[in-house]
């Protein structure tokens, strides 16, 4: 669920306070008692990398569409009335940043900035350095705890009350930050690297799967295909009718997320070449107005209707605002079987009546929770 803060500056103040308290408090009261000079330099280098990457994630613009951008025929045409520019594929208008953002992932309350095409590598490096530093610190703290525990019954003059107090405070705090930030990095890796998706596109996939589960997706994507490729009729009408008459069709057989090429290509598209992943100022390899696509996306007029459907831009049902009406909405279903009438209660999902801009996933997240200005979608 998206986090919303009453005072937006707390989004930066809280992480900065935790980084400073855990990083420098642990060094001064604990690590300086037993680490060598070189080890302390290495530790502080990691702390510095946190601050550098955090600064860049905050102050680097996530990417603005060029004023003269013109979408290709293979994309949905989506014009932003506020920015007065066509949005490139994967771009959205952020209601907080008040701009269209290239390959918008989400608006992050912890950076007071959108995470988009241009600053996604900085955001990922920030998460990486926080995890690496807190994991390294936790390793040192656990080792120190073990040592102090093993010599607890011996008389030694190096025992420090302040060190023991700060170990008791810093260890659980450090572990908490490590676990929470690791879960966020894991989500980013799962979406961007394994599936080539932004968080918004992952939400969109949930919506598409929900439409398919309700048997409402196939007819909509066929409508979109016919609108874009009217020349396929009447030659493909029989194939379309046959497909619609099937009792069940797997979603993977007619929908395709075009930006999922393979994990290695996905991560290089987002982060740049591997040897620059940890370089603080490295950028993505493209300007963010077009992206590599998998082979299923490319249209072939001689292919099957299923393959043609896979060539639709994302999302395949189009950038629609309203969904089709669904009858009376009654939860009572009547079935006649073997001469007997059976009446049963059929659960109704209230989301069935919602369009794209109002639909929410199982976490309660809608497009606006990711920072998207839904009035301009």
From Swiss-Prot:
Alphabetical keyword list: Acyltransferase, Endoplasmic reticulum, Lipoprotein, Membrane, Palmitate, Transferase, Transmembrane, Transmembrane helix
Transmembrane segments: 10-30, 123-143, 164-184
Keyword check for Nuclease: no
Catalytic site: 108 (s-palmitoyl cysteine intermediate)
Disulfide bonds: none
EC number(s) stated in the UniProt entry for this protein: 2.3.1.225
PROSITE patterns for this protein: DHHC
Record's protein name: Palmitoyltransferase PFA4
Stretches in topological domain Lumenal: 31-122, 185-377
Job of this protein: Mediates the reversible addition of palmitate to target proteins, thereby regulating their membrane association and biological function.
Occurrences of domain DHHC (ranges): 78-128
Database matches in Pfam families: DHHC
Membrane topology of this protein: Multi-pass membrane protein
Cell compartment(s), UniProt: Endoplasmic reticulum membrane
Domain notes: The DHHC domain is required for palmitoyltransferase activity.
GO molecular function: protein-cysteine S-palmitoyltransferase activity
């Amino acid at each position: 669920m998206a986090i919303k803060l009453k005072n937006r500056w707390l989004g930066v103040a809280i992480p900065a306070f935790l980084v400073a308290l855990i990083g420098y408090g642990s060094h001064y009261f604990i690590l300086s008692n037993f680490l060598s000079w070189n080890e302390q330099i290495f530790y502080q280098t990691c702390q510095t990398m946190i601050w550098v990457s955090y600064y860049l994630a905050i102050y680097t613009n996530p990417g603005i569409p060029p004023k003269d951008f013109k979408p290709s025929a293979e994309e949905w045409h989506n014009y932003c009335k506020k920015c007065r520019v066509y949005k490139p594929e994967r771009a959205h208008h952020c209601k907080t940043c008040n701009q269209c953002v290239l390959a918008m992932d989400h608006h992050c309350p912890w950076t007071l900035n959108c995470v988009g095409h241009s600053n996604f590598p900085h955001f990922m490096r920030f998460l990486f350095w926080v995890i690496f530093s807190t994991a390294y610190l936790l390793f040192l703290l656990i080792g120190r705890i073990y040592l102090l525990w093993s010599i607890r019954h011996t008389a030694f003059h190096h025992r420090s009350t302040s060190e023991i107090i700060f170990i008791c405070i810093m260890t659980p705090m450090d572990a908490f930050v490590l676990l929470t930030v690791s879960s966020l990095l894991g989500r980013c890796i799962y979406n961007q690297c394994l599936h080539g998706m932004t968080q918004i596109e992952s939400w969109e996939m949930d919506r598409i799967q929900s439409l398919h589960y309700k048997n409402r997706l196939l007819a909509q994507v066929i409508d979109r295909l016919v609108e874009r490729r009217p020349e396929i009729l009447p030659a493909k009408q029989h194939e379309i009718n046959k497909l619609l008459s099937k009792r069940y069709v797997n979603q993977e057989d007619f929908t395709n997320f075009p930006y999922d090429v393979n994990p290695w290509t996905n991560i290089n598209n987002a982060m740049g070449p591997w040897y620059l992943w940890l370089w603080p100022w490295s950028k993505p390899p493209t300007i963010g107005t077009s992206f590599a696509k998998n082979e299923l996306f490319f249209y072939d007029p001689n292919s099957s209707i299923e393959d043609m459907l896979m060539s639709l831009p994302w999302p395949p049902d189009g950038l629609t605002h309203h969904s089709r009406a669904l009858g009376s909405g009654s939860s009572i279903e009547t079935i006649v079987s073997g001469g007997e009438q059976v009446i049963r209660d059929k659960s109704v999902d209230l989301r069935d009546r919602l369009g794209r801009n109002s639909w929410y996933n199982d976490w309660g997240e809608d497009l606006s929770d990711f920072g998207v200005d839904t009035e301009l979608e």
